[in-house]
Amino acid sequence: MNDIEFYVYHVVTRKKMKIGQIIHFDKNQTNTLYRFFFEREQLNSSGDDGIKIINNHYKNEELHIKNENAKVVMSYIDQTIRTVRKTIVEMVRLQEFPEYPSRLSCLYAAKSYEDALKWKALFDSYNREVLQIVKLRVIGNCFEGDGNLLPKEDGIPFSQKIEQAREYWKGNVSNELPELLINGKIEVVEIIDDFSAIHI
């Protein structure tokens, strides 16, 4: 797939961006989504992870976990099922749709300012702090997907999750709020809204 030039909008949530800032997403660059799910550890105050806690508390075919250990185990389970989902989606992309940007090595964007405002409203509803909405010039690739088609965070067989991932990578057909995955050379060309002063 050849790189193309296009403009999109990005809802900034972690660190403010500046006009002229350049971001490169290629096959070796991971995004914060990757780091959040694949590099984060869930440990109790003794340094035990979720699996060790489960093994230490499973006796006589019963499992009793409470307090800090229960929180660590539940966080570990939540992170693990979401990481499995992301791994399946990436596996299907690599095998069947390698021309599309990876969800683990991309920036998430919106096609229009109006869509960016919809994403901001969604983030606000989850109390996720939005710092800015910026306009980006991209020389790279994009994929428009429907997040509702991603594999669910449930216990269905992996074979069904693979089918769900396939449906996602077929592209957005009729979603009210598409997610745009972009990669390549990305430049901030305009700060449209700066909400950071509101959060002081």
Language model: regions and residue ranges:
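Conserved NAD+-utilizing ADP-ribose enzyme module
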Residues: 2-6, 12-80, 103-105, 114-127, ...
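A short acidic-Thr-Gly-centered motif at the start of a beta-strand
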Residues: 97-101
